[in-house]
Amino acid sequence: MAEAPHIPVLLGPLLRAVAPVEGTWVDGTFGAGGYARGLLEQGADRVIGIDRDPAVFRMAEAWAGEYGDRLRLVEGTFSDLDSLAGGPVDGVVLDLGVSSMQLDQPERGFSFLRDGPLDMRMGGDGPTAAELLNTAPEQVIADVLYLYGEERASRRIAKAIVAARPLSRTGQLSDIVSACLPRPKPGQSHPSTRAFQAIRIWVNDEFGQLVAGLAAAERALRPGGKLAVVSFHSLEDRIVKRFMQARSNSAGGGSRYAPEAAREEPAFTLPFRRAIGPDEAELATNPRARSALLRVGIRTEAPAGRVDPAALGLPLLSERRA
């Protein structure tokens, strides 16, 4: 039997939260296939694995055949999951952000710890990080760093990036960012963490994809179907939280985030009052899980509605990609 893929964060809590697992599920961020395999082992009749990165399907060839036609792999973005699934589904799983697999490949340009080409694209299309940073106005770069990375030194870093252009390597970008920030104290994250996160989100339109993907999941799920979303930082989780509050009418009367949704029949119920995080055992074996949060919604019989990105707190640039 082929070696199993790595176990993704919060797999156990996710499978328990959506039990019983049955019918057809969509793994909208297939990656190394850990969630898809977990769903299949727990009783899903079929899993449709979607990913925008064609490399993940080549890696899955070593083990995917074990499941025969129970596993179907589709290249695409989870923002189109309702059309890619080809019909109603019983569950949707989304694991947001960059995968450890992508971080471990310097040639993909995601890591500030290993020098590589300044790419950061999850798929093979669209402009690279280098192309965007080398052509965008300084103000747009500053907005990206501040809105997508919550980087307080955004203006200083943007000015340094423009002064150093053209950029072509991740190491070059990391050195520029680090030179603009104080040396980190023991236990603090790398100085480039927030900037690399922000630029990656920009390159891949991750927040736009997230809002569209949540809406697509609402359209795709049968009544009683389950939506499970794992996020890794506060900006992602805020969007997911507000979506679920808005679509379940649980934000409270008069919420400024969902004034229209509160007048609609709820599209989801929320089985858990709070997000689910990792336990001590998982943290001991997988430090990457420390910031992970799982939110779950259960689809009602209400028709799918319109999702207003502004109502979800989606950070909006004044100028898209320059």
Swiss-Prot record:
Per the record, what are the reactions this protein catalyses?
Answer: cytidine(1402) in 16S rRNA + S-adenosyl-L-methionine = N(4)-methylcytidine(1402) in 16S rRNA + S-adenosyl-L-homocysteine + H(+)
Which GO CC annotations does the UniProt entry carry? cytoplasm
SUPFAM superfamilies for the chain: Putative methyltransferase TM0872, insert domain, S-adenosyl-L-methionine-dependent methyltransferases
Q: Which family does it belong to?
A: Belongs to the methyltransferase superfamily. RsmH family.
Quote the InterPro entries the UniProt record gives: RsmH (IPR002903), SAM-dep_MeTrfase_MraW_recog (IPR023397), SAM-dependent_MTases_sf (IPR029063)
Presence of keyword Methyltransferase: yes
Which molecular function term from Gene Ontology is one that the record holds?
A: rRNA (cytosine-N4-)-methyltransferase activity
List positions binding S-adenosyl-L-methionine.
G33, G34, Y35, D51, F78, D95, Q102
Q: What is its main location?
A: cytoplasm
Give yes or no: UniProt keyword 4Fe-4S.
no
Keywords, ordered alphabetically: Cytoplasm, Methyltransferase, rRNA processing, S-adenosyl-L-methionine, Transferase
**Pfam families listed in its UniProt record:** Methyltransf_5
Name of the protein in its database record: Ribosomal RNA small subunit methyltransferase H
Q: What is the recorded function of this protein according to its Swiss-Prot or TrEMBL entry?
A: Specifically methylates the N4 position of cytidine in position 1402 (C1402) of 16S rRNA.
Question: Could you tell me where this protein is found in the cell?
Answer: Cytoplasm
Q: What is its EC number?
A: 2.1.1.199
Q: What Gene Ontology biological process does one annotation of this record name?
A: rRNA base methylation
